[in-house]
Amino acid sequence: MLLRRLVRPLLLVLPLLALIGGARPALADPGDIAAASRGVVRVVLVRSGFLGTSMLGHGSGFAVEPDMIVTNAHVVQDAHGDGNVVIGVIPSQGSASYPAHIVAYSPANDLALLQLGNHAALQPLTLFPGAVSDGMQIAAVGYPGNVDAAQGLNAGDMVTPQDTVKTYGQVSSGRSSRQFDTILHTAQLGAGNSGGPLLDTCGRVLGVNSFGTVSDNGADSSFFFAISMRELQPFLKSAGVIPHLASLPCTSIADLDRADSQRSADDQARVAAEALARTAAREHAFDKARHDAELDVLSERDNGLALAALLLVAAIGAATFAFLQRQRGQVRGTRIGVGLLIVLVLGAGFAWILRPSLSAIDDRAKDRMAEVDASGTPAPDGDGSTAAAAAPQKLICVLDPQRSRVTVSDITDVPLQWSAGGCVNGKTQYGLAQDGWSRVLVPNGEDTIAVTHFDPAAHSYTVERFLMGIDDMNRARAERSKIAFPPCGASEDLARQLGSAQAAIKTLLPAEPNERMRYTCQPAR
């Protein structure tokens, strides 16, 4: 506020720079660039003296820690060693401005580090330490003075939070500054862009915009230089700053959706092929079972026929024996012969009757298939109780990079304990809706909304992160305050009520998340 009072009476006359060339199509993800812009600031210099105050100029910068700003050394050179020059930092959102002082100054590679006062808590940007390829799509974010002049902004407006200006282009590699390592690119810059970040399509910092080329007629041309990571990382390390780094390839949500659709189609084709294979295998197994059953039945019928014939032959022998005994007057022998005859005839009849019928072939084949099916079905657990199924599952969830888009978050394994009813880690109750179990997390200390999903059947855990502006974040916090969150392990009705209540927050979210992290969960060891 002191800075605003110092410069409000002043009018800053800015030169209107000629606009050269047409804008390239914005191929970067607007959501990621907007999210990164939350940590981009305007850096202003004001001199105070006996004759009053005057604004010396302004540039851009970006946060690498909540209270640490990177900018160009030439932006703050007038304040270096001069106690009469005040540095002010104005963020792109909110209503506050912050005093700053130089903590590291390196004119050799045009870098400076500022520390903010007044308990500043800006959104740090993430740096990309990987290789920058030729033709790579990029975005420059900052506060070009020609835009301020075209809008008619006065000095008071300059110390009021304003939206950043974003321009887009591509890397033109192969040429670097002789003084220090730089990235040559075509994203339009103007006076005032100095110190702002050069971003990739995921909103990660590739370099610090520094200067542009000048054509023969003195006008800005369409090639510009940004200080590369080879200069920035050692500079920050020497200053004791550990920035957040992310080196995964930059993929879009649309790319993930296409890959998921293709993967789903492949899975459906695989499932269909497996179903056909199982059907063919079952038909083959049934044919074999029927063939085996047919052989068994025919064999048993032949054995029964042979046994009946053998018994009939024996019965003829018994009849002959009984006849001879009667001719000889042997009553007892006759009775024995007749008894044997009766037994053998009955045995032959039973042997014939007990032969399996041909219709038994199909029945036996079905019985054999039932045995095969039963042997392929896993047995239930020993206790077989529902209590065992409802016991908490301790899982460890590992990121699947091929199905994830990670731009600014750290990659770590996630321990997760899931209980039936939607209780996570014994303290967080998930809501139940048509899309399954989920929880919307709206923190107070970070302008990020996370929507987490868990599929108990597939053991799949998904986190979608939305990097929000301060106004949208405040609206989401207001909606969160209206929700009565049930205790962990609540009834299904309460879980469904929570799922419905969270929908009010989801309506405030952008169409696509900035990050989508898919995890595969396995039992923890």
What are these regions (language model features)?
Residues G31-D32, H58, V64-P66, V70-A108, ...:
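Catalytic-histidine neighborhood of serine endopeptidases
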Residues V75-A79, Q123-A131, M136-D181, G190, ...:
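Flexible, gly/ser-rich surface segments that form the specificity/activation loops bordering the active-site cleft
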Residues N146, S210-L295:
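C-terminal cap/linker of serine protease catalytic domains
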Residues H284-E371:
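C-terminal single-pass membrane-anchor helix
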Residues A36-S54, A112, G117-P124, Q151-K237:
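Active-site region of chymotrypsin-like
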Residues V40, E65-I87, P91-A150, Q179-T182, ...:
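Conserved active-site neighborhood of the chymotrypsin/trypsin-like protease fold
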Residues A360-V424:
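Membrane-interface segments at or immediately adjacent to transmembrane helices
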Residues R47-P66, S97-P99, G304, R518-A524:
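A conserved glycine-rich beta-strand in the N-terminal activation segment of trypsin-fold
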